[in-house]
Amino acid sequence: MAVLGPKATLAAVFIGPFIVACMLGIGLVYLLQLQVQIFHVKDTIRVTGKPATVSYTISTPVTPSATTLDGTTYTLIRPTSSYTRVYLGKTRGFDTSTFGPKVLDYITSSKPHLNSGRPYSLSC
């Protein structure tokens, strides 16, 4: 067996165990990451759902109105007598259905300008 010099002995004693320790450390880090992925620990940090907003109103909004070309203003009245508490904004009004878009039918509060005997019927 050959006799190792002092430099070779230093390398064999310190560098070899250092390489083994580095390999063990890398292996432990890999196993820790694998365990985190298996138990979905990272999912508790991320936001996975899309945020949504629902607007509610406590009081009845301002009654919509229609103005003709000659400047006459008519108040639009919903033909139904009951409202839900959910108000979906100016374009959709009250939503009385459980799902889907709602088409609102309005009638005017007074007879039309030409006095035909029937109020205007508007659909939004």
UniProtKB/Swiss-Prot annotation:
Record protein name field: Non-structural protein 4
Membrane spanning stretches: 12-32
Keyword Flavoprotein: no
Keywords, sorted A to Z: Host membrane, Membrane, Transmembrane, Transmembrane helix
Alphabetized InterPro entries for the sequence: Corona_NS4
Coiled-coil ranges (or none): none
A Pfam short name: Corona_NS4
Species whose genome carries this gene: Murine coronavirus (strain S)
Topology within the bilayer: Single-pass membrane protein
Lineage top rank: taxon: Viruses
